[in-house]
């Protein structure tokens, strides 16, 4: 992978101890993944109500709580590694995809790429319509077919990402409540019952 110092977008606390520390949010089995995120600078990347590291860990925990397969959960942990349609900056460039795959596995990396590559303005409105099977890639500008399994994983990750932010920030929740309700309603047939119930509980 590229040098984290060259790829990370540090937050206000750029100076830190170089010794990686495991977040209490992660179970011990994921210590290696937590340390890798810190090497990439996720703990210095400012995000809603804290750091990107905190958000990534919490997103993964939601996906696990809802009973998702491990590749989907690991993709949730790394869903912003290449940046997203909602986050400026990235932890690594696309030339590091093989390195990310070595850490979380090829299936999880492919899902993390899919999430980061989504052109939200063009693809989100397609969800719930026949056009949902054609993905729009913001990195390449291309459109291509998406499998049902990949679309379901993408939607589940989307709900987890947005709900984690909504739970962490009252202002975010109030600002985006209506649009998220509409988006999740279109995803209803693609997400788990647990994700649907969590959305209803958080957004009302």
Regions found by a protein language model. Name each.
Residues 2-204:
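Metal-dependent phosphohydrolase cores
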């Amino acid at each position: 992978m590229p040098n984290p110092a060259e790829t990370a977008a540090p937050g206000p606390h750029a100076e830190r101890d170089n010794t990686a520390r495991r977040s209490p949010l992660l179970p011990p089995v994921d210590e290696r993944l937590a340390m890798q995120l810190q090497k990439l600078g996720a703990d210095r990347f400012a995000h809603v109500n804290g750091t990107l590291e905190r958000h990534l860990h919490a997103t993964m925990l939601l996906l696990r709580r809802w009973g998702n397969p491990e590749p989907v959960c690991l993709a949730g942990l790394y869903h912003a590694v290449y940046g997203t349609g909602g986050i400026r900056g990235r932890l690594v460039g696309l030339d590091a995809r093989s390195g990310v795959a070595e850490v979380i596995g090829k299936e999880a990396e492919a899902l993390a790429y899919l999430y980061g590559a989504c052109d939200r303005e063009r693809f989100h409105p397609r969800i719930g319509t026949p056009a949902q099977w054609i993905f729009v890639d913001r990195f390449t500008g291309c459109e291509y077919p998406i499998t049902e399994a990949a679309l379901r994983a993408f939607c589940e990750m989307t709900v987890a990402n947005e709900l984690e932010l909504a739970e962490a920030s009252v202002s975010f929740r109030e600002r985006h409540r209506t649009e998220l309700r509409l988006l999740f309603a279109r995803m209803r047939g693609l997400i788990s019952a647990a994700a649907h119930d969590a959305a209803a509980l958080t957004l009302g």
